């Protein structure tokens, strides 16, 4: 059983540690805000100028003037700070973000990431991802393992323009949890009911498998 988007986000949330400052990219990463583990305190950063982002609002608490970088309505927690983009990016470029969680079109076995441009589609530009991949201490990617045509998105070399080089540390896809190590993609966990052989078939890059691979707890 492949993981859905919320299950991917929930698994990524278990990577967070108490005291972390965390930036959530657009797409699946924004869902991580709903699954912060009990007993830890993390501060979520939105690059449009908010430190202290909370979970998504209910219909009763929604505020149309309060949005994240992806233009989704959000909440904020007590003690939050609002500031301009220059200050926000000074935090990023200064190396103050412990973990960045990004979506991606492609990731290579060396940790390269392509996350901003698809040929033939009009796009405004790379956005804040270029700063995040260069400055964050740790980068985790949330993504589907294959594209709509069933082709692998975990590659030997990216086919799309790069966002960053050798920067991704870990991937949580709908099929697996994978760590980028010397020599390729190291399989750490697999989605419930998904075999190692299925993951290998869906991975173009070199998949490293050591011993028994546990299932992801969902």
Residue spans for each PLM region:
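N-terminal active-site beta-alpha-beta segment that forms phosphate/nucleotide-binding
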Residues: 1-77
């Amino acid at each position: 059983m492949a993981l859905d988007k919320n299950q991917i986000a929930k698994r990524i949330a278990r990577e967070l540690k108490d005291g972390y400052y965390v930036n959530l990219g657009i797409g699946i990463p924004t869902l991580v805000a709903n699954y912060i583990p009990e007993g830890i305190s993390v501060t979520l950063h939105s690059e449009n100028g908010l430190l202290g982002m909370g979970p998504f609002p209910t219909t009763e608490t929604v505020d149309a003037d309060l949005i994240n970088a992806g233009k989704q309505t959000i909440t904020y927690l007590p003690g939050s700070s609002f500031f301009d983009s220059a200050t926000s990016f000074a935090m990023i470029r200064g190396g103050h973000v412990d973990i960045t969680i990004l979506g991606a079109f492609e990731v290579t076995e060396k940790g390269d990431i392509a996350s901003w441009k698809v040929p033939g589609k009009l796009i405004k530009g790379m956005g804040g991802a270029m700063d995040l991949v260069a400055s964050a201490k740790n980068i985790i990617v949330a993504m589907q393992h294959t594209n709509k045509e069933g082709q692998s998105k975990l590659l030997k070399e990216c086919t799309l323009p790069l966002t960053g080089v050798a920067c991704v540390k870990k991937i949580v896809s709908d099929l697996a949890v994978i760590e980028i190590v010397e020599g390729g993609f190291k399989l750490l966990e697999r989605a419930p009911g998904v075999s190692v052989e299925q993951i290998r078939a869906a991975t173009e890059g070199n998949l490293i498998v050591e011993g028994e691979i546990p299932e992801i707890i969902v």
